[in-house]
Amino acid sequence: LRTRRCAQGSSGSACRVCKLRNKCLGIHRFKPIGSYPVAVFKLIRRVAIVLVILYASLFALTKVIHYPEPIAAIRLGLAPASKTPDLMPFHYIVAAPSTFAPWKNGNSESVQNVKYDGKRITFDDFLKATSTNAFMIIRDGKITYESYLNGKSQSTILPSYSVAKTMTSLVIGQLIDEGKIKESDAFVSILPEFKAGTSFDKVTIKDLLDMNSGIGVSDNYPSGPSGWGVAIAQVYASTDVNWWLMHNRKMREEPGTFPEYRSVNTQMLGLIIQKITGRSLSDEFTDRIWQPVGAEHDATWNVDHKGGFEKAFCCFNATARDYARVGQALMSGTPKIASKAWKTRLSTPAVKLDYGWGYSAQMWHPYPGINLMLGLHGQYIYQDVA
């Protein structure tokens, strides 16, 4: 037996360790298990039981709302942007060695000092201050500047976030050119299982392309855990995007009347592609875009579950050089990944969104003569077409 001074320490009080109720001398005798009293182990056991019940409850909840299991969901929510592609299942977009087109180097150009946060700093310091992982300049089809930071390299797969929206639009544009769909087609005419009996049924492909559907799923939500319960954050982590859309068809405005940037629109375009072609968005993108531009590396597109649907609004991942190949092909017309008509559609602002910037068919227009593919965490494919 060992002795331990009473935590209560007063005569006549109930002792929490030995539960004496008559007279407490301030000293207890107890039989230790290892080096801890029985009460400590009881407390640990109770806490463990509570945690197991809590985890089981959360696990059951994630199954009901089609979310990853709790630990996976927390890892995804807290991960830095560059790590998220590996935390969700994905489909491969396969590069073809036979179509690989090596980059040529042009005359090297230096980037001058820039104004950032009210100060003039070197461009290298700017890249570091903005946590940039890769930066390239392509001029006249040749690389004139290329820099990698934070341990990244030419072969590093980087997430695009909403740059993926324009990638999805390129496939939609080809389907329109082929006469397989029209911009005037209603979404539910292609996927009738989503009919809601409301103005949702009037939403057209054009509405989706120009962020003008009126579907009430906002992209405005708090960062961090406080925003995880918001609808658009839910679809990012969802293990069943069809289930998610079925439960998020509420309309905020009439279609075509109130343009606002909402990622749900692009997700619906992705579902259209899979329904019309009978193939995954990844497979269509491989054949229509990736191999024709001569991509060097395989890319990935995150999906809701293995063999499921791509998250068309966000989750395309590739190397910096291969992103640049898509941008260069779209600008030069070689290889042809967009018809003249679709390039005009992409380049002609249809509505005004945030900051008064123009927007059309999943492409931003911040200034005249500029086409911009823009991702949430500072991903850009910036085209000066003037």
Regions found by a protein language model. Give the residues of each.
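Cysteine-centered motifs
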Residues: 6, 15-18, 24
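N-terminal leader/targeting segments and the immediately adjacent pre-domain N-terminus
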Residues: 33-153, 181
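Flexible glycine/proline-enriched surface loops and loop-helix/loop-strand junctions
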Residues: 153-154, 249-255, 265-267, 305-312
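Active-site helix/loop module of the DD-peptidase/beta-lactamase fold
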Residues: 159, 177-216, 220, 250, ...
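Conserved active-site loop region of the serine DD-peptidase/beta-lactamase
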Residues: 279-297, 309, 313-383
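Amphipathic alpha-helical interface segments
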Residues: 225-236, 247
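Active-site SXXK
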Residues: 141, 158-184, 208, 269-273, ...
